[in-house]
Each structure stands twice: as structure tokens, then as C-alpha cells.
């Protein structure tokens, strides 16, 4: 899907933007469902209490419902991000399999050799692990892929713990808990 739409039809080619759009399309339904479930699990008495205090429906949503649903929303974002970090298949066909040599003196966003260009090919850690294991061009491929997998795992763990701390902090800050 991502290859056909973003690479071929929109003519973005193998690029960061093609990979990002493909991953967004793939993960949007799951994230939407998680946010919807979080908002539905806010007890109706809290909504009614906000309305009984005389605040508008919009203020009830902003000041009562969303702060109460925030841990579930953060969880949904973390789950979707975890899937994105480990995604290799969609990125192989949309973002490419290798990163080009970058010209660090070139800051033109449209140049494919610029480090800030979203139109250049890219290689994520998950794609790197797949590529090292499947091509066999590196003599110590097992060690390189194991090291890359360890870096990816550590990064995901740090991200998850950071997201949990952020969710707890925001929940305490926005609610009376």
C-alpha cells in the first residue's frame, strides 16, 4: 500500500516522507481506537459533575475528560510508537534500504544529500538489522545485528519509561490525584 501510493503514485520515491506517511496510515486506526477507548472510560459522573458546576461541555471535555483520559492516550501513543520503532517491512518498500552519503554543509531541504531533507532515503535500525542478516555482506553479521538489536531495544525501553513518567506527571498535574 505505502509503496503503491506514496512511492509510485505521489512520486515521492524511496524517502523519509514516504516511510513516515505509510507508518502514519498503518498506525492511525490503532491509535484512534486507543484514544477513543480512553475517552469512553472516563466515568459519566465526572462529566455530569463538570456540567453541574456550570461549565460548558467544551470546558468539561478540556478540563475534566481529557486530563482523566490522558494516561490511556499516552499509552496509545506509546504502543503506536513501539510498533513504528520496530517496523521494518513497510519501511523497506517506502523509505529505502540504505541511507545516502550526507553532505553536512548542504542545508537545502530539497537536496537528497542534505541531512535535513525528508526526500532522501533512510535506514532505520529495524531495516538495518534485516539488511545485515539477509545480505550476508558483513563477515560478523551476527554480532552487528545483535548489537543493533540491543541498541533498538534499549531505545524502546527508554522511550517507554520516559512516556510512563511523562504520563504520570501530566496526570498528577492536570487532575486532583
Task: Report residues per predicted region.
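Generic hydrophobic transmembrane alpha-helix motif, especially the helices
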Residues: 1-20
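Small-residue-enriched core segments of transmembrane alpha-helices in multipass membrane transport
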Residues: 19-27
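Transmembrane alpha-helices
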Residues: 31, 35, 57-95
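Membrane-helix/interface signature in polytopic inner-membrane proteins
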Residues: 36-47
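Short coil/turn motifs that cap or connect alpha-helices
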Residues: 45, 56-57
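Interhelical loop and adjacent transmembrane-helix boundary motif
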Residues: 91-152
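Generic alpha-helical transmembrane segments of integral inner-membrane proteins
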Residues: 153-165
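Short cytosolic juxtamembrane segments of multi-pass membrane proteins
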Residues: 167-177
Amino acid at each position: 500500500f505505502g509503496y503503491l501510493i506514496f512511492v509510485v503514485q505521489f512520486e515521492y520515491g524511496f524517502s523519509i516522507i514516504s516511510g513516515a506517511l505509510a507508518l502514519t496510515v498503518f498506525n492511525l486506526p490503532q491509535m484512534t481506537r486507543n484514544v477513543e477507548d480512553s475517552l469512553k472510560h472516563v466515568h459519566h459522573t465526572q462529566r455530569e459533575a463538570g456540567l453541574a458546576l456550570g461549565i460548558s461541555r467544551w470546558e468539561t471535555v478540556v478540563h475534566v475528560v481529557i486530563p482523566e483520559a490522558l494516561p490511556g492516550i499516552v499509552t496509545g501513543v506509546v504502543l503506536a510508537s513501539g510498533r513504528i520503532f520496530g517496523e521494518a517491512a513497510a519501511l523497506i518498500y517506502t523509505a529505502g534500504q540504505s541511507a545516502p552519503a550526507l553532505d553536512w554543509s548542504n542545508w537545502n531541504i530539497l537536496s537528497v544529500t542534505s541531512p535535513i531533507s525528508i526526500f532522501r532515503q533512510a535506514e532505520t535500525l529495524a531495516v538495518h538489522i534485516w539488511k545485515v542478516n539477509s545480505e550476508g555482506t558483513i563477515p560478523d553479521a551476527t554480532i552487528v545485528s545483535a548489537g543493533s538489536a540491543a541498541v533498538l531495544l534499549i531505545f524502546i525501553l527508554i522511550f517507554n519509561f520516559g512516556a510512563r513518567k511523562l504520563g504520570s506527571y501530566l496526570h498528577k498535574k492536570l487532575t486532583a490525584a
